[in-house]
Amino acid sequence: MRIGHGYDAHKLVKGSHVVLGGIKIDSEFSIEAHSDGDIIIHSLIDSLLGAAAYGDLGTFFPSEDDKYKDISSRELLKEVVFKLKEDKYQISNVDVTYVGQLPKLNP
């Protein structure tokens, strides 16, 4: 059994929305990032990559590579899951916690 721990943080800037867990949420802020800036999926990806000893998100998907510009983090997650399956890894459980003041997620 392998265990990974993922983490992601981005700067908030004036904008129109954020993407969290693949869901677009209207907001007066946006997350500054090369991709869609989905910190929930980025953290999950980072954890999966770490558990498999593949490096981190920035190594696997470098921000200098224009093919990842504005890409949906869901697509990045699909690539990682495909690579894990290809290498015979099996994901048995994940747990993600969002810590942030904005956007407010409570009803």
Identify the residue ranges that each predicted region occupies.
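A generic structural signal for residues located within well-ordered alpha-helices
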Residues: 35-40, 72
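Conserved, well-structured core segments that form or line functional sites
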Residues: 94
